[in-house]
Amino acid sequence: MDLSPDELAGVVDLFGALTRPELKTALVELAFKQSEDPPDESLIDTAIESYHLVKSEDALTVGPTAFPVIPDGGTDLPHIMDIESRKVDRDRLGRAVEERFRTEAARAVATEDEEAINRLIDVSYDLETWGPVELANARELLAD
């Protein structure tokens, strides 16, 4: 089964937040519904790296670059898995994601990784819209 990062975010968005094992179970259930093999777990890591999903303590939630799309059969997952919708503290999550962003930005600047710098500049705008963070200074550093 091939899922885009936005579809993976759509699965998580159905619940508000999922632990990694719960997300893996949801993907197995979704694959079963579609008569396909579940996606490789690396899809989750790729979605985290691209800020489509972000870690919140021990759970994953929809990240700033995601435009969640519910994949075919996805709307049945809350009933199949019997997991209540969860709320995430957006302020605390925003601070955690900001810290991760600033660490990645510093690393990209130190290694002069132009691809990472350009990607992080784009992410900074999404992150400011998504959470209560201000990244103008970090963006200036990246642009310089």
Predicted regions and their residues:
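Alpha-helical context
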Residues: 2-3, 81, 96, 114, ...
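Positively charged, polyanion-binding regions of nucleic-acid-associated proteins
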Residues: 1-17, 42-46, 97-108
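Short arginine-rich
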Residues: 34-36
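Short capping segments at the starts of secondary-structure elements
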Residues: 13-22, 32
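Leucine-rich, amphipathic alpha-helical/linker segments
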Residues: 81-109
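Charged low-complexity interaction tracts in eukaryotic proteins
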Residues: 2-3, 18-21, 38-92, 130-140
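Glycine-rich, aromatic-bearing surface loops/beta-hairpins
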Residues: 101-144
